[in-house]
Amino acid sequence: MSTTPLALARTFLFVPADRPERHARALAAGTGGVIVDLEDAVAPERKASAREGLVASFAALPEAGRQRLLVRINASGTPWHDDDRAAVAALVGQGLIAGVVLPKAERAGDLQRLAEAIGPQGQLVPLIESAAGLAAVDELAAAPQVLRLAFGNLDFQADVGLACDADEAELVPVRLALLLATRRAGLPAPIDGVTADWRDLQRLAADTARARARRGGFGAKLCIHPDQVAPVHAALGPSADELAWARRVIDAIRSAGGGVVSLDGRMVDAPVVRLAERLLALDAQPPS
């Protein structure tokens, strides 16, 4: 399992590809990853110019920041996909981005071709946004160079004809399917979808709680506004009580020299130790 910054990131902030003045500001917003969007955020007539401007925009960014950059290209089968794929291959080759988000991911072959284009140093994030993508989720998760799975909750609803309430209860089985595919492929925790109303912090908190690693198994969330970043990062991290428990577990197992010990009347064995270690590792991943 990857331990790169993007593998551990809790937040991924979208920013339009055709607004280069926002790219540096997005990196400075404290998000774990920035997704520069050539798809939904850019009108068809502006896609070519937006694509052509990425080299200059990214070259002006700090090298450390580039390692947190992903580009969402247009989906396979669209008129812009092939040109996007060539562009991101060049960007990865020049060390200007870490990888690529593929929307409407439905076929492992598309990821294979994208991996071949960007080379082995590039990372891929397939965005599951359709019934076909869900049906192929194990193949997508197992494709080469996949970093994490991501869930496009709004597009998925549109694809299958759902009209979910705020709690998105109808999508629980879908999220579970992504979680299980992630586990089978040995990937870091998946990335949950957006909360569309960025001003509704109560809704954001509820959405993030639903996606919490402890409850829903998701370790990160897509964000559409900088104001969402800090609350999501905090909500997806371990609580003070969880950290205190994790430290006590590690101390107990070290004092015993390994094996199985009892703590607060409960058995502490290898799975419990791994959970404690994971909580402490999450706490060690600060906002960027």
Question: Locations of the language-model features?
Answer:
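Expand to "…catalyze enediolate/carbanion chemistry for C-C bond making/breaking, isomerization
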Residues: M1-S288
